[in-house]
């Protein structure tokens, strides 16, 4: 099914070609059009519902790729790597790579909001994934072009363990379980020698200390504490199902 407006149809076909997909693919064009319509354009016909679906789809796509590529990787690392892959920063980066901003319908009031641009692009990217998934009820229109991005990023993250985002993984778990965020308490323990572990961090939830760690920076110490906590409180099967 094509759209009523030939110009919009051509725009969407251009995007599909950038994704490396044939325009004869079983795409529901009306959904793809909706995925690229910001709420400022229409309060009812916009990408918000597709973004909700796409949020789950991108996490599934990342999880499957990681499982296939790194079958021996600890499941806790899977969650930490995936938290980076599905972050707004990465999704907005991919959206720019495919020129989504050229096809995203946004009212003038939002176009001047430069601060919110990254969030808009990430949301639209998720919505596009949602539209493609709902077109076939599987990942066949997504994995052929998304896998190699995620695979390359995952390899870079594994080479630099500091990029593993256990803080995000822990936050995701606590929000899902308790609807609250963990609390981090950081103290400076080694001011004299800044080349060594300078900060100690503790992570707390509901009055209970979940983990502690040290690092050369506050961020590194918090990540170390989050890793201890996350791996201690989340069974492997629960991490896999997040």
From Swiss-Prot:
BP GO annotations: mRNA processing; regulation of gene expression; rRNA processing; tRNA processing
Q: Which GO terms describe its molecular function?
A: double-stranded RNA binding; metal ion binding; ribonuclease III activity; rRNA binding
Report the InterPro entries cross-referenced here: dsRBD_dom, RNase_III, RNase_III_dom, RNase_III_sf
The UniProt entry annotates the active site at 55, 126
Chain ranges of the DRBM domain: 165-235
**Catalytic reactions on record:** Endonucleolytic cleavage to 5'-phosphomonoester
Major place of localization? cytoplasm
The kind of enzyme this is, by top-level EC class, is hydrolase
Gene Ontology annotations for the cellular component aspect, listed alphabetically: cytoplasm
Give the EC number(s) under which this enzyme is classified.
Answer: 3.1.26.3
Keywords carried by this UniProt record: Cytoplasm, Endonuclease, Hydrolase, Magnesium, Metal-binding, mRNA processing, Nuclease, RNA-binding, rRNA processing, rRNA-binding, tRNA processing
Task: Give the disulfide map.
Answer: none
Indicate the segments forming the RNase III domain, all copies. 12-137
List required co-factors. Answer: Mg(2+)
> What quaternary structure, including any partners, is listed in this protein's UniProt entry?
Homodimer.
Function of this protein?
Digests double-stranded RNA. Involved in the processing of primary rRNA transcript to yield the immediate precursors to the large and small rRNAs (23S and 16S). Processes some mRNAs, and tRNAs when they are encoded in the rRNA operon. Processes pre-crRNA and tracrRNA of type II CRISPR loci if present in the organism.
| Similarity annotation | Belongs to the ribonuclease III family.
Which NCBIfam families does the entry mention? RNaseIII
The name this protein carries in UniProt is Ribonuclease 3 2
Which species is this record about? Answer: Nostoc sp. (strain PCC 7120 / SAG 25.82 / UTEX 2576)
């Amino acid at each position: 099914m094509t759209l009523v407006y030939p110009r919009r149809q051509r725009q969407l076909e251009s995007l599909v070609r950038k994704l490396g997909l044939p325009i004869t693919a079983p795409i529901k064009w009306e959904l793809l059009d909706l995925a690229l319509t910001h709420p400022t354009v229409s309060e009812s016909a916009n990408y918000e519902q597709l973004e909700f679906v796409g949020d789950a789809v991108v996490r599934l796509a990342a999880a499957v790729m990681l499982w296939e590529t790194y079958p021996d990787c600890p499941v806790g690392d899977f969650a930490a790597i995936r938290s980076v892959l599905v972050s707004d920063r990465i999704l907005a980066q991919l959206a720019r790579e495919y020129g989504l901003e050229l096809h995203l319908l946004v009212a003038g009031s939002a176009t001047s909001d430069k601060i919110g641009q990254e969030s808009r692009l990430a949301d639209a990217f998720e919505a596009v994934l949602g539209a493609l998934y709902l077109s076939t009820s599987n990942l066949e229109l997504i994995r052929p072009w998304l896998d190699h991005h995620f695979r390359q990023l995952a390899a870079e993250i594994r080479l630099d363990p500091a990029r593993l985002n256990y803080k995000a993984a822990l936050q995701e778990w606590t929000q899902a379980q308790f609807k609250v965020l963990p609390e981090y308490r950081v103290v400076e323990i080694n001011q004299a020698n800044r080349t060594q572990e300078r900060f100690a961090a503790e992570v707390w939830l509901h009055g209970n200390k979940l983990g502690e760690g040290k690092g050369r920076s506050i961020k590194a110490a918090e990540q170390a504490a989050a890793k201890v906590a996350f791996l201690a409180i989340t069974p492997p099967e629960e991490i896999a199902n997040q």
